[in-house]
A protein has these predicted regions:
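An exposed, glycine/acidic-rich loop-and-rim segment of catalytic or binding clefts
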Residues: 1-222
Length: 222
């Protein structure tokens, strides 16, 4: 059975409460998430020998998350990754977005979802966070209502589900910007770790990390 505790972790510069949720299962594994940026703060899991370690990177104090350039563990949007030159065309209309990464638009702008307080609530063994992005927010068309659902169970499985509704055709690409170190935070480099992604295709990017729009076959890639 998963138990969920919550407490006020700190305050934003604007005086909003930052809530920290701790989800703990019967095996002693736990996940901590915050309503600031709908962020994963820590994931403490047993390794193959049963030794517990925090396997994601995070900050010990909430102030570390204020406009954190690495967006550690945060939910980013409206659009994760880059939009070239901060310009996009939707249904024949051109929209200009904030340029916040060299000459490009990154992760939805400076005041993207990673740098906001989300509404949050507990539902049985899950935490649900939500926010409303108004029409024109960061230059995007349409009001966007977003939910991030964090599920944790006694098999040590953590699942995030993102849901979005909009009243206009728009661009939405939500993700969580978590950094893993399966040997434990602070244990050293992850360059010798092996990762398997159950994906059949990969989105091609150019040398500026801008998506080209081409979907490439993932078969045979490293």
């Amino acid at each position: 059975m998963v138990t969920i505790e919550q407490h006020v972790w700190g305050m934003t510069p604007e005086g909003e409460a930052i809530i920290l949720y701790t989800m703990r299962n019967d095996k002693g594994a736990e996940v901590k998430i915050s309503n600031f940026g709908a962020a994963i703060v820590s994931v403490t899991m047993p390794d193959r020998e049963g030794r517990m370690a925090d396997v994601v990177l995070g900050y010990k104090h909430p102030e570390g998350y204020f406009f954190d350039g690495a967006a550690s563990g945060k939910s980013v949007g409206r659009c994760a990754n880059r939009i070239a030159f901060g310009q996009m065309t939707v249904e024949g209309k051109e929209y200009r977005l904030e340029v916040n990464n060299s000459v490009n638009h990154l992760h939805g702008g400076t005041k993207n979802f990673a740098n906001r307080i989300w509404e949050s609530r507990v539902e049985t063994n899950r935490v649900v966070m939500s926010l409303v992005s108004e029409d024109g927010d960061q230059g995007y068309p349409g009001e966007l209502c977003v939910e991030a659902v964090f599920d944790f169970d006694d098999d040590n499985a953590l699942e995030i589900t993102y849901l979005a509704r909009t009243d206009k055709t728009t661009v939405v690409n939500l993700t969580n910007h978590v950094y893993f170190n399966l040997a434990g935070e602070g244990s050293g480099s992850v360059l010798d770790h092996q990762l398997r992604l159950n994906s059949s295709q990969v989105l091609e990017m150019n040398d500026k990390q801008i998506p080209t729009g081409r979907l490439l076959d993932a078969a045979g890639t490293p």
